[in-house]
């Protein structure tokens, strides 16, 4: 079974991140031969308890890891921090607000399996 590491920078995402994670998990249930892990990075969210929600997800699901950056370093730095904790065969970056809908994941993985180093979906 191949493992896909889903890395998601999170900023003021307390109200949205659970839905994103659980929708992605539902998509993986439809795909044979794959499982996933999540590396969620709170990028210093000042307005809500994003990291608290990430910790709850980590307690509920064994495939969820959380990182807490003490201040906002920006999306790219949050992604780089996440990469140090991935263990998957492939890495898939997503946004915390579903700019790439979880239903598109199978298309991205298919392209990665074809050998592409970078896969993008234009919606």
Model-assigned labels for residue ranges:
Residues 105-118:
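Conserved donor-nucleotide/metal-binding helix-loop-beta segment in metal-dependent transferases, i.e.
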Residues 42-51, 98:
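A conserved acidic beta->alpha catalytic loop
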Residues 32-45, 67-68:
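Short beta-strand/loop segment that forms part of the nucleotide-sugar
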Residues 13-29:
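Short, well-formed alpha-helical segments that are part of the catalytic scaffolds
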Residues 52, 69-86, 106-107:
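Glycine-rich, basic loop-to-helix element that forms the pyrophosphate-binding segment
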Residues 121-123:
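Conserved small/polar residues in nucleotide/adenosyl-binding loops
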Residues 91:
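Short aromatic/hydrophobic "clamp" motif used to bind/position activated sugar donors
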Residues 3-5, 37:
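Cell-envelope/extracellular polymer assembly enzymes that use nucleotide-activated donors
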